[in-house]
Every structure is written in C-alpha cells, then in structure tokens.
Amino acid sequence: MTKAELVKELRTRTQASMSECIKALDASENDIEKAIIWLRENGAIKAANKLKNAATDGVTLAKKVGNKAILIEVNCQTDFVAKNENFLAYANQILEEALAKVESKEDFDKLIINGKPIAESGLDLTAYIGEKIVFRRGEILKANDQQTLGVYTHNNNRVAAIILVDGKVEDEVVRNVAMHAAAMRPRYLNEQVVDQVWLAKEREIIVNQLEHEGKPAAFAAKIIEGRLNKILKENCLVDQSYFKQPELTIEKYLKNNNAVAVGYYSYEVGEGIEKAPQMSFADEVAAQMKK
C-alpha cells in the first residue's frame, strides 16, 4: 500500500488524527500493527497538548427521563471523530450521568465520569483518538405534575432542543415544538426574556439602515418599531410560525393543545466557536507529508 493508503487504514482502525498516524507509521517502519502499539504508548503523553486545540465539532444530545430533560454538547475537532463509536459512547455516558445526578445547571461541573471530574474525563479518549475531546455545556429543565417536557435531537446529532410547557399534553405535541425549535433556532422563549443589550444593538442597526436609506425623519420611529417587532417575532419561539402549520404561531399551536411554553433551550454544535478552514482528506495528507 502507498503511504496515504496506510495512513487511511490506520486512521480508520484507531480513530487517531492524521498527523499522529503519520508519526506512528514513520516510527514503526510503516508496519500498521506496530504503529497501533506506538499510538497507544504515546497517546497519553500527547493528550495534554491536544487540549490546547480548538474543538469545534462534536454532538448535541437531548433526552428526558421522568420529570427531567437534559441537553448537552460534547466537542471534538472533526466530523470524522464526531461519528466515532467511542466518542459517541462517551457523550451518551455524560448524558445518562446528567439525567441521574444533575438537578441544576451548576451540577454539570460536578459530574464524575469514569472516576474523573467531567472537565478531565475526556483526557483518556483524547489520548486514544488523538483529538481534543471535551464536554462543553449543558442545560436542564424540570417539570412538576402539571407540566410536560419535550425533547428533540436531529438525526445527525448536530442540533437539539428541550422545552417545558405548562399543561399535561401528548408527547407528540411537545416533541413537535422541540423539533421546530431545533430547526429554527430562536434566540429566546418569549419577549419577556429577551436580552436588552442584544435588542439595543438591533435597534442601532435599524437606525443606521434608515440613515443610509434616507427615510423621512417623520416616519423613522414607526419604521424602527415595525422592523424591531419583526426581529423579535423571528427570534422568540412562541411568536414564530409553527413549521408544520404556518398559519399558527407556536403560542397558538400550544394554546390549541391547552399548553403554554415556559422553558426552552437549544444547541447547535460549535456555535460561537471560531472555526479553522476545513481541508479535504487529500489536502490534509499532502500537508502532513510536507512536514
């Protein structure tokens, strides 16, 4: 096999990064079995250095058990590892531990995974896989006897949402709302919880737009309020048009089912993290061969 083919096979078998596979093969005279041993022996030493890297890929997962719904994000560096069974097992382990032990948002940082604090629990997997593996964040919603929880995780594990409503409703109803939330990604549940700093910035943008458009000052205030209301409706879950029945808002859809939304969170993998430019497999091999 060519060096590139050896690298690809070693990466497939070990889930190690491209650069680590090349180093392992170089140190093992291109013997794959010896390279696997080299990776295992050297992984732990290099894991700490991997933690300095940016982990912008990964998964978001949501699940409910009893009166509790949990939403988490666990990160790695590439979509290749995000699909790895060991990585997915680790992420699901965190999810199950959170469902069993988390009672408030602060409890996520107190979780113990495989005998280690959650902040350190990804180190062994980082050593084995060769990419930074880290728990990034989590949210919890809890229901009382007169409330219902809804959860949704998209089938690619890249977006997920949890929702809490007042009222006892069918699971399908709250799952539909959670699915809508995961797809549309509204910033807020309703206008009452809108970040006023964000709202002020949106207003400032509109004012600057009107200046460039040369709109008459007499109409400026009305135009500003109109555009701001439109932005609020687009960014508040309860005011959005329900994607399965666009003639209804989410608020109206829930009202028709005797429910009111009172809690909501959604995650998208890597949101807010600066991402490095992506390379193809061939380009990545070529770049590593030049080192």
UniProtKB/Swiss-Prot annotation:
Gene3D superfamilies: 1.10.286.20, DNA helicase RuvA subunit, C-terminal domain, Elongation factor Ts, dimerisation domain
The entry's keywords: Cytoplasm, Elongation factor, Protein biosynthesis
Cystine connections: none
Chief localisation class: cytoplasm
A Pfam family: EF_TS
CDD domains recorded: UBA_EF-Ts
GO MF annotation, one: translation elongation factor activity
Region of interest called Involved in Mg(2+) ion dislocation from EF-Tu, as start-end residue ranges on this chain: 78-81
Subcellular location: Cytoplasm
GO cellular component terms, A-Z: cytoplasm
InterPro entries hit by this protein: EF-Ts_dimer_sf, Transl_elong_EFTs/EF1B, Transl_elong_EFTs/EF1B_dimer, Transl_elong_Ts_CS, UBA-like_sf
Family: Belongs to the EF-Ts family.
Function: Associates with the EF-Tu.GDP complex and induces the exchange of GDP to GTP. It remains bound to the aminoacyl-tRNA.EF-Tu.GTP complex up to the GTP hydrolysis stage on the ribosome.
Protein name: Elongation factor Ts
Source organism (scientific name): Ureaplasma urealyticum serovar 10 (strain ATCC 33699 / Western)
Gene: tsf
